[in-house]
């Protein structure tokens, strides 16, 4: 730390957050400092990072290898009681706690962080200065500071001078709540938000993604109320300035498909859409690494170098990484600053209005076509449905698909009612003349997953407009218009019925999946607008 940096850190008054007796503050340390801190030989347990042959540090996040939605809480008070989409109003994770319970949880975290040497990372959430959040993250764990330095937008020296946080995140991963039963909570772990105080607190879970997605949930509360779309999507832009956004749940291909050598990446996960166009919320990417190969995903593989941070991967004794090993979790990840990808929008991660909106789904039922163009009504229907499906493998190789319906392709992060996001998105799409497509990156009647080469060919056809020139035919039940051929794509997969030896198999699977869609969509039919959308969905 320079003398100047030391002075700046010393000027930070952490007592305003209830943190006392802090022995030292490292404010916005360099990557070099963080590397030294997180690989210190005296560190133990989950605090310790290990060096890998690719130059990046790998860490273990403990028993939590993903977010813990059952432990997510929001204070119900005058700020939130009438605006927030609460868990008793629909299928979501926004469980209410009282201000009194919040005070107890907050004091567990402040007690944990007091008297310690702390890392403070000040960063921005949102590339647009008018609507971004100034976020201050406080943690005692070096690699958690590294994670947020990667994931939030890094301020310049000048921007740090007068930095005043709009939101504070206190990560007390080592603190747990012994009184959770008395509080009526799910477990000793907690991720809680107070929108009046503008504070997030974390206890019991070490998973880095809680900090990133926590601020996403807050943007999802603040932006739509200003008429700005807040979206769980990746985005990129072509040479002619044509912007595409890719919505999708985890594992459907958002990061992979938006990282395209022919186009500049805007961002891989969280974006807003305002009067100027599409802008990234983040300063980094958070890519899945399970079964990562240099051949299939060279950009992501090459981004794993010094300053990237790997989570829960298997590191062999010779420092090499086994990306195929999912024994700890299938959700192995890497975070890296966005400039680790060569082809990005610079200097600010933003571009114009989107012309193409792509809904990614990984259908494990083998029913949906690899691509279909959506009508405006179908766009709303599929956005509110937010369907994907996972294959749950068992040791005997029996695989049953598990459907997931997640409103707006991100229900876990929504803080307002899903129809509010649909309304804002459709308004933005109409104003920009954008078109929507559904792209299935999942399985078909062959039992194999649609190849990444075919999916990339489909995306190319959407982006260059050749799909709009293609002849189409109608897929029954779901009433989807699909192309009969596309350049560079295996034509035999475009109608999913053709991938079955017996077409009746598709019929019975389609009926099963359609019933699931209809049952899920019933939650939106309590008003006229929702009822009117039913005919845009599957019909039996």
UniProtKB/Swiss-Prot annotation:
<keyword id="KW-0963">Cytoplasm</keyword>
<feature type="binding site">
    <location>
        <position position="269"/>
    </location>
    <ligand>
        <name>Mn(2+)</name>
    </ligand>
</feature>
<keyword id="KW-0456">Lyase</keyword>
<dbReference type="InterPro" id="IPR001272">
    <property type="entry name" value="PEP_carboxykinase_ATP"/>
</dbReference>
<dbReference type="GO" id="GO:0046872">
    <property type="term" value="F:metal ion binding"/>
</dbReference>
<protein>
    <recommendedName>
        <fullName>Phosphoenolpyruvate carboxykinase (ATP)</fullName>
        <ecNumber>4.1.1.49</ecNumber>
    </recommendedName>
</protein>
<keyword id="KW-0067">ATP-binding</keyword>
<feature type="binding site">
    <location>
        <position position="207"/>
    </location>
    <ligand>
        <name>substrate</name>
    </ligand>
</feature>
<feature type="binding site">
    <location>
        <begin position="449"/>
        <end position="450"/>
    </location>
    <ligand>
        <name>ATP</name>
    </ligand>
</feature>
<comment type="subunit">
    <text>Monomer.</text>
</comment>
<feature type="binding site">
    <location>
        <position position="213"/>
    </location>
    <ligand>
        <name>ATP</name>
    </ligand>
</feature>
<feature type="binding site">
    <location>
        <position position="455"/>
    </location>
    <ligand>
        <name>ATP</name>
    </ligand>
</feature>
<feature type="binding site">
    <location>
        <position position="333"/>
    </location>
    <ligand>
        <name>ATP</name>
    </ligand>
</feature>
<feature type="binding site">
    <location>
        <position position="67"/>
    </location>
    <ligand>
        <name>substrate</name>
    </ligand>
</feature>
<feature type="binding site">
    <location>
        <begin position="248"/>
        <end position="256"/>
    </location>
    <ligand>
        <name>ATP</name>
    </ligand>
</feature>
<dbReference type="InterPro" id="IPR013035">
    <property type="entry name" value="PEP_carboxykinase_C"/>
</dbReference>
<keyword id="KW-0312">Gluconeogenesis</keyword>
<dbReference type="InterPro" id="IPR008210">
    <property type="entry name" value="PEP_carboxykinase_N"/>
</dbReference>
<dbReference type="GO" id="GO:0006094">
    <property type="term" value="P:gluconeogenesis"/>
</dbReference>
<dbReference type="InterPro" id="IPR015994">
    <property type="entry name" value="PEPCK_ATP_CS"/>
</dbReference>
<keyword id="KW-0547">Nucleotide-binding</keyword>
<comment type="similarity">
    <text>Belongs to the phosphoenolpyruvate carboxykinase (ATP) family.</text>
</comment>
<dbReference type="GO" id="GO:0004612">
    <property type="term" value="F:phosphoenolpyruvate carboxykinase (ATP) activity"/>
</dbReference>
<comment type="pathway">
    <text>Carbohydrate biosynthesis; gluconeogenesis.</text>
</comment>
<keyword id="KW-0464">Manganese</keyword>
<feature type="binding site">
    <location>
        <position position="213"/>
    </location>
    <ligand>
        <name>Mn(2+)</name>
    </ligand>
</feature>
<dbReference type="Pfam" id="PF01293">
    <property type="entry name" value="PEPCK_ATP"/>
</dbReference>
<dbReference type="GO" id="GO:0005829">
    <property type="term" value="C:cytosol"/>
</dbReference>
<feature type="binding site">
    <location>
        <position position="232"/>
    </location>
    <ligand>
        <name>Mn(2+)</name>
    </ligand>
</feature>
<comment type="function">
    <text>Involved in the gluconeogenesis. Catalyzes the conversion of oxaloacetate (OAA) to phosphoenolpyruvate (PEP) through direct phosphoryl transfer between the nucleoside triphosphate and OAA.</text>
</comment>
<feature type="binding site">
    <location>
        <position position="333"/>
    </location>
    <ligand>
        <name>substrate</name>
    </ligand>
</feature>
<keyword id="KW-0479">Metal-binding</keyword>
<dbReference type="GO" id="GO:0005524">
    <property type="term" value="F:ATP binding"/>
</dbReference>
<feature type="binding site">
    <location>
        <position position="297"/>
    </location>
    <ligand>
        <name>ATP</name>
    </ligand>
</feature>
<keyword id="KW-0210">Decarboxylase</keyword>
<feature type="binding site">
    <location>
        <position position="213"/>
    </location>
    <ligand>
        <name>substrate</name>
    </ligand>
</feature>
<feature type="binding site">
    <location>
        <position position="232"/>
    </location>
    <ligand>
        <name>ATP</name>
    </ligand>
</feature>
């Amino acid at each position: 730390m320079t003398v100047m940096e030391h002075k700046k850190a010393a000027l930070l008054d952490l007592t305003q957050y209830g943190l006392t007796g802090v022995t030292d503050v490292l404010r916005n340390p360099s990557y070099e400092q963080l590397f030294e801190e997180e690989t210190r030989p005296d560190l133990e347990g989950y605090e310790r990072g290990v060096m890998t042959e690719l130059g990046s540090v790998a860490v273990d996040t403990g028993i939590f290898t993903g977010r813990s939605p059952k432990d997510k809480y929001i204070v119900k008070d005058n700020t939130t009681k009438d605006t927030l989409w609460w868990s008793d109003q629909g299928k979501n994770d926004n469980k209410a706690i009282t201000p009194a319970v919040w005070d107890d949880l907050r004091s567990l975290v402040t007690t944990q962080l007091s008297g310690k040497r702390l890392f403070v990372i000040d960063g921005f959430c949102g590339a647009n200065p008018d609507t971004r959040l100034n976020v201050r993250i406080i943690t005692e764990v070096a690699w958690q500071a590294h994670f947020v330095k990667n994931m939030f937008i890094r301020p310049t020296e000048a921007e740090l001078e007068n930095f005043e946080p709009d939101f504070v995140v206190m990560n007390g991963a080592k603190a747990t709540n012994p009184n959770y039963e008395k509080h009526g909570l799910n477990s000793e772990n907690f991720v809680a938000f107070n929108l009046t105080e503008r504070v997030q607190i974390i206890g019991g879970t070490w998973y880095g993604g809680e900090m990133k997605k926590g601020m996403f949930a807050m943007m999802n509360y603040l932006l739509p109320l200003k008429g700005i779309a807040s979206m769980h999507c990746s985005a990129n832009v072509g040479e002619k300035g044509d912007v595409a956004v890719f919505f999708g749940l985890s594992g459907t291909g958002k990061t992979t498909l938006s990282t395209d050598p022919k186009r500049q990446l805007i961002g891989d996960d969280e974006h807003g859409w305002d009067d100027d166009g599409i802008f990234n919320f983040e300063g980094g990417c958070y890519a899945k690494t399970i079964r990562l190969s240099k051949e299939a995903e060279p950009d992501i593989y090459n981004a794993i170098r010094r300053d990237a941070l790997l989570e829960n991967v298997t590191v062999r004794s010779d420092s090499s990484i086994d990306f195929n090993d999912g024994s700890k979790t299938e959700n192995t990840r890497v975070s890296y600053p966005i400039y680790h990808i060569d082809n990005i929008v610079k200097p600010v991660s933003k571009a114009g209005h989107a012309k193409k909106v792509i809904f990614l789904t990984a259908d494990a039922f083998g029913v949906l076509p690899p691509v279909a163009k959506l009508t405006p009504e179908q766009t709303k229907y599929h956005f509110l449905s937010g369907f994907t499906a996972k294959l749950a493998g068992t040791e005997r190789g029996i695989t049953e698909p598990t459907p997931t319906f997640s409103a707006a392709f991100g229900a876990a992060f929504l803080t307002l009612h899903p129809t509010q996001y649909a309304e804002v998105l459709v308004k933005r799409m109409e104003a920009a003349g954008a078109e929507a497509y559904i792209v299935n990156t999942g399985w078909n009647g062959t039992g194999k997953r649609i190849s990444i080469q075919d999916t990339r060919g489909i995306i190319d056809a959407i982006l260059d407009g050749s799909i709009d020139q293609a002849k189409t035919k109608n897929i029954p039940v779901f009433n989807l218009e699909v192309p009969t051929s596309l350049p560079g794509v295996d034509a035999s997969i475009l109608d999913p019925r053709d991938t079955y030896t017996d077409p009746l198999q598709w019929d019975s699977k389609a009926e099963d999946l359609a019933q699931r869609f209809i049952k899920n969509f019933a939650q939106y039919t309590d008003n006229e607008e929702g009822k009117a959308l039913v005919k845009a969905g599957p019909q039996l």
